Amino acid sequence: MEFYRRCFEQNLKYAVIFEDNVIVKDHQLYDQIQSVIDVMGDNFEMCFFHCLSRYPDRRENGLERVKWISSTKCYLIHVENMKQYYKYFFPIDNHVDMKHEDIIAEGARVYYKDMRKYMRIDRGKGSTIGHSDWGKKGYFSRQYPNVKTDVLIRGY
């Protein structure tokens, strides 16, 4: 969450977050990210370029709008737009990469664009945050507690 605070203080318009296990395979990744900015302008809060799984909503401007998404390996934020949603990350009562469902529920426009062609994830080491199935194998979301995992689209 420190990252958001620094972006706000620096008055950035956009920021891209890469986790430390993202490996850029093709520098066209940056052109693809710029194309999202060019198309979406100020009309989004976040766009993910990696996910383990997602619950799609609809297509908009060549991107997939999502109701829910997991994993935060690489994504773009519209810094000014995210200011109104920052408070919904708190309290941190779930993994940060799972808190995005809370800002989506509050109206954040969150998208996905598959960028596996341009990057890969080094999975040589295990996750440091751990994950849970909440004791229910079909459960994936607090916002959609009665929706089963078969609606999810798997990422990479």
Predicted regions and their residues:
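An acidic/histidine-cluster motif and surrounding catalytic segment
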Residues: 1-18, 22-156
